[in-house]
């Protein structure tokens, strides 16, 4: 899955991980992974 990570200072990054987005449990794991990888993110959105 691919995410856009927004930070409080205004910059953004893209982040991709290798989870199956068609599987609900793996989608949840992908979101958890993104939040754990970027704990200081202001907002994370799916791309």
Enumerate the predicted regions with their spans.
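A short beta-strand micro-motif
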Residues: 1-8
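Short, mixed-charge low-complexity intrinsically disordered segments
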Residues: 31-47
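Assembly/interface hotspot detector across virion components, adhesins/toxins, and nucleic-acid enzymes
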Residues: 4, 15-17, 41
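A short, exposed loop/beta-hairpin motif centered on an aromatic-Gly-Thr core
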Residues: 11-25
């Amino acid at each position: 899955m691919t995410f856009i990570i927004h930070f409080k200072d205004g910059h953004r990054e893209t982040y991709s991980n290798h989870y199956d987005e068609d599987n609900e449990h793996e989608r949840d794991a992908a979101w958890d992974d993104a939040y754990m990888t970027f704990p200081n993110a202001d907002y994370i959105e799916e791309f």
